[in-house]
Regions:
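Charge-rich, well-structured scaffold segments of protease-associated domains
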Residues: 2-15, 26, 32, 43, ...
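A domain-level signal for the structural core that forms small-molecule/cofactor-binding pockets
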Residues: 271
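Active/ligand-binding-proximal structured segments within catalytic/core domains
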Residues: 36, 43-94, 205, 281-293, ...
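Flexible, small-/acidic-enriched active-site or ligand-binding loops
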Residues: 255-256
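Short loop/turn motifs at secondary-structure junctions and domain boundaries
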Residues: 20-23
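A short, compositionally biased domain-edge/stem linker segment
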Residues: 16-18, 39
């Protein structure tokens, strides 16, 4: 249930002959430049747009507790100025071509991106690279942007679903970096210094951790040339790309129950379990399970809780996936007097799925939903850029849409049942945001989720 946090601001290096790694099955072309910078492109016929993203394999889980929120703070700060551009210059050049410039931070990576017409591709590559590589951490800018981030935290605190998402992951993962909010805390942001942010930038933002992803009406060789120019002075010979993020998550703490008091008309509930890391091989079986359980209007949770009983307006399930772990969660927002029954029905639905799996008809609908969602989401260059940038950072390879659709179709009911039996019998965490001051004031069915 974690959400990425967008920024609110919308000479030539030594030549190394880098072979183009063309992958005709996926339509993605890939070149590795000196310094370990990876350049991946996808040509989309029939469009006049180009989307450019510089992906950095650094996110909030890479922070020490004393600088919690640094990756997101830095994402904001780098737009303030570079040696050759002021914040106004950056805004005006993008406004002048009708483009979009933005960024977001997640647990494991940060992306700075631009969306422009194809004629403005050279400007977009140069601008995004300038911000990422040469954005300055000036003390005055740090103090100004600190207030912006604190306002963003206040805005998060006023949005029950956003607040709940952060509280749930903390309840599930404890004080592990995956469990900490991407945005940080008031305490960490207020105490963070210019030197800490500058050090984070210099140490973490290196080409070997970066991917330049470009999609649209683009030519791969031209993009490589633009990359050499934009990253000149940073492409050091003999440096290879950083390996993909892997590892095994080890936690000593058990999932917990979190309660945040808010004088609200509704109560917001999230409950769920630790799930699989992205390299464990259960991605699509879990996706099918998620779609069937809480992914749409015909899902079990929606039908049982809203359509049959009218207990909640919004109810859905979701999956968060990280390199070495993940989360499967269910959200519901309801009147306080309905919370106990909502929690009971959710647990009954999940228990039935863990015992009996889902029907063939549910699997067919879930697969159709995944197929349609995947294809429809890739009809613009921004979505394509996101897909190839994430794939390069997370997996180091690229699959075509057709290959992915074939993989989805191959998921069996036995695989879905196995995933359900493994996940839904694990210890649950829960988070509640609403008009309750003490855990003991919560309905017994909610406290029972984590054995309270």
């Amino acid at each position: 249930m974690a959400k990425t946090t967008p920024n609110t601001t919308r000479s030539r290096s030594a030549v190394l002959k880098s072979p183009i790694d063309a992958t005709p099955e996926s339509g993605v072309q890939r070149t590795v430049l000196p310094g370990g910078l990876r350049v991946v492109t996808e040509f989309i016929p029939g469009v006049r747009s180009a989307s450019v993203g510089v992906w950095v394999g650094v996110g909030s889980r890479d922070e020490q507790p004393s600088v919690a929120g640094a990756a997101h703070f830095l994402e904001h700060l780098l737009f303030k100025s570079t040696p050759s551009r002021t914040a106004l210059d950056i805004a005006q050049v993008m406004d002048g071509v009708g483009g979009e410039l933005n960024a977001f931070t997640s647990k494991e990576h940060t992306c700075f991106y631009a969306h422009v017409i194809d004629d403005d591709l050279p400007m977009a590559v140069d601008l995004v690279a300038d911000v990422v590589l040469r954005g300055r951490c000036r003390t005055a800018d740090v103090d100004v942007e600190r207030q912006v981030v604190l306002e963003e935290i206040a805005m998060r605190d006023d949005d029950p679903e956003d607040l709940l998402g952060d509280a749930f992951l903390t309840a599930l993962f404890g004080d592990h970096p995956v469990g900490r909010p991407i945005i940080g805390s008031v305490e960490s942001i207020e105490s963070m210094s210019r030197n800490q942010l500058h050090s984070f930038h210099v140490r973490r933002y290196t080409p070997q951790r970066m991917v330049l992803a470009v999609a649209g009406n683009v030519d791969h060789k031209q993009v490589v040339t633009l990359a050499r120019r934009a990253f000149a002075g940073h492409l050091e010979r003999g440096v290879k790309p950083a390996p993909r993020r892997e590892g095994t998550l080890r936690l000593r703490t058990m999932p917990e129950l979190s309660l945040t008091h808010r004088d609200s008309e509704q109560v917001h509930l999230a409950l769920g379990v630790r799930a699989f890391g992205r390299h464990e091989g259960h991605r699509w079986a879990l996706s099918v399970l998620n779609a069937a359980v809480g992914g749409g209007l015909s899902s079990r949770l929606f039908q049982e809780i809203r359509e049959k009983r009218g207990l909640a307006y919004s109810v859905y399930s979701g999956v968060d996936t990280f390199a070495d772990t993940g989360a499967f969660s269910v959200y519901a927002g309801c009147q306080p007097e309905n919370l106990g029954e909502v929690a009971t029905v959710i647990r009954e639905v999940l228990a039935n799925v863990a015992t009996d799996g889902i029907t063939d008809a549910e699997i067919a609908r879930a697969k159709g939903s995944l197929r349609g969602g995947l294809v429809l989401a890739l009809e613009d260059s921004g979505s394509r850029m996101n897909r190839i940038g994430r794939s390069e950072l997370n997996y180091g390879n690229h699959r075509s849409v057709a290959q992915t659709l074939t993989t989805i179709d191959a998921v069996t009911s036995e695989e879905v049942l196995e995933v359900a039996q493994v996940l839904l019998t694990r210890p649950f965490a829960a988070a509640v945001v609403g008009p309750y001051k003490r855990v003991r004031d919560l309905p017994a069915s909610v406290r029972g989720i984590v054995g309270k």
